[in-house]
Amino acid sequence: MMNYRTSIYVVLSLVIFLNVQRSFVAESSAKRKVHIVYLGEKQHDDPEFVTESHHRMLWSLLGSKEDANDSMVYSYRHGFSGFAAKLTESQAKKIADLPDVVHVIPDSFYKLATTRTWDYLGLSAANPKSLLHETNMGEQIIIGVIDTGVWPESEVFNDSGFGPVPSHWKGGCETGENFNSSNCNKKLIGAKYFINGFLAENESFNSTNSLDFISPRDLDGHGTHVSTIAGGSFVPNISYKGLAGGTVRGGAPRAHIAMYKACWYLDDDDTTTCSSADILKAMDEAMHDGVDVLSISLGSSVPLYGETDIRDGITTGAFHAVLKGITVVCSGGNSGPDSLTVTNTAPWIITVAATTLDRSFATPLTLGNNKVILGQAMYTGPGLGFTSLVYPENPGNSNESFSGTCEELLFNSNRTMEGKVVLCFTTSPYGGAVLSAARYVKRAGGLGVIIARHPGYAIQPCLDDFPCVAVDWELGTDILLYTRSSGSPVVKIQPSKTLVGQPVGTKVATFSSRGPNSIAPAILKPDIAAPGVSILAATTNTTFSDQGFIMLSGTSMAAPAISGVAALLKALHRDWSPAAIRSAIVTTAWKTDPFGEQIFAEGSPPKLADPFDYGGGLVNPEKSANPGLVYDMGLEDYVLYMCSVGYNETSISQLIGKTTVCSNPKPSVLDFNLPSITIPNLKDEVTITRTVTNVGPLNSVYRVTVEPPLGFQVTVTPETLVFNSTTKKVYFKVKVSTTHKTNTGYYFGSLTWSDSLHNVTIPLSVRTQILQNYYDEN
């Protein structure tokens, strides 16, 4: 029998419940939007039970089972607990007040961020002792890709010679428009699609008339392209119209691919977009299916959200994936060269910057004075003999308007450009300026265009058989001076040729987003760099391509290169954690290119690359297989990190599924065991702790070498680390002090542990801040 206090509680609960029901019913006609209700770590292993609990929560608040079913978009039930549902703003606020709910936030959208890459990085298929052969090219490793889908007919998904599907694979091949289970094989072992979040936010979307396929099939080509880079099979004799010829393959060519399509083409806007709700569901399914590596070439824009904020769906999903042993690799973004633009900055994600290759597409321009200038283009049409060259400008005796600015060529009269090669200048950072200039000139009857622009922006294919050649402003000015000084200037354009090797330097791409990390300045981002400029890989047969292959540029292309390397490392070291894999990649990276030359960062002006451009450096796959020491981390480290940056204990507890109490005083974020040290606000001195784990020879002795940042003193204690059968982990302290007396920018150095076989290097990035939290505009 109930006592008086219990009876009162029941009555009050019923009253509150009925009032909530009534208010929810009254709001049913209000505008509903997709909201993600994040509940943290799942409390039950049975996914059906988890989903039922989600429906019960919605049912109790919406008033009926039918309304709950209509509202539900997704149930996240494998890697973590939560759901996406269509709710009014008021309904979302009420659900957010429930004690089991960590966050409720509106759905958000993400945007999409080879033949030479692997030979350039030293990952040779011809060397029988290489990492490729030591790991049997990634066999039995599953790379999950979240993107625009897959074109299964491409030869890069050929499963010839493949053994059985890995026993830990639990996924499947989902059917849909122009896609059925027969499109999967032993290479492409899984394909699923997630569209509910996209549909809920785009009610006018007409799936019948849409160009996109309502299935795992790729329309855009982006998903097929990045899958090729990560794990595509060998396809010989591939080129782009005769350029960049060779064998296309992925980093782990015998790894298995699972595609999770979460990005969709919106016909009305002519854009491809990815709902956070769909991405989270794709990650949830990938965790269930058994992927070993997740490759995500998507990103949001700054300002960023914190790591426990569900608004960054990739960060939240990645946290749960990493705790399950899945390495998550993400693109760093294409908003460079400005600082503070890098995205996907969570400390459990490997964030990737993009570099050029040692390859260019030289296009000879011969002026009438016999001077030869090597421009850049992807022009494979017939050579153009000596032809009149013009820079549209007012000669001083005309009332007509002339412009040599590329964007304004359309305002020139046709007779200005007809039958000529046109020189123009642009300050635009975008490849579209090149294409637009070519269109204007061709429309006017011109025969070619030379575009002078800032160096560093990726060369793109132009109009078919129409020469559009890029030069920098310096060379463009040389051509302009010749044009002005000659009575009858002419130019000859020859087809482009592929140059490979030492004459072509490696650079961090202009578009590659830069650090420092805007959300957590003590966490170095990006982590690592990989080639991402003019990468030749497979695409769909619905896109402009050659032989079903196309060249694309972006950190989207760099991230899957690291995913391929991570797959090889996982195949070689099955017991390594995602943090150990990241450490091995970062600490063994090249600080120079493979030929020993300095790596520059493109921009205005170009400069020597530093950790905010490329993290630890340019990935060195062979060295990463045997790093000697690793900076490892697990759940306890991530909890200490979240405590150190001020996240509340309740959020952390729900995130990890168990009670968390942060220490008082709270730990220092500088002690987070990253393979880097970044100090954003040093006033006088600080001492930092790191722990390294020996993964090399059992009995090893390492000695430290420090290259201190300019104006800083760095002391390491102890200076020697000794490992044996009983000592596999050792911690050391790093004391950093500044001699600067004013607020400074960042200075860079490095710390290296060396034995006779290994050099384990981490970057140091330090800024003096005598006056804290101060913005200086002077």
Curated annotation (Swiss-Prot):
The keyword Glycoprotein applies. Residues 388-483 form the PA domain. Its main location: secreted. SUPFAM superfamilies: Subtilisin-like. GO terms for cellular component: cytosol; extracellular region. It is found in: Secreted. Residues 34-113 form the Inhibitor I9 domain. Glycans are attached at N69, N158, N180, N202, N206, N237, N399, N414, N541, N648, N724, N759. Residues 23-113 form a propeptide. Gene3D superfamilies: 2.60.40.2310, 3.50.30.30, Peptidase S8 propeptide/proteinase inhibitor I9 (3.30.70.80), Peptidase S8/S53 domain (3.40.50.200). Residues 117-625 form the Peptidase S8 domain. Belongs to the peptidase S8 family. This is Subtilisin-like protease SBT3.6. It comes from Arabidopsis thaliana (Mouse-ear cress).
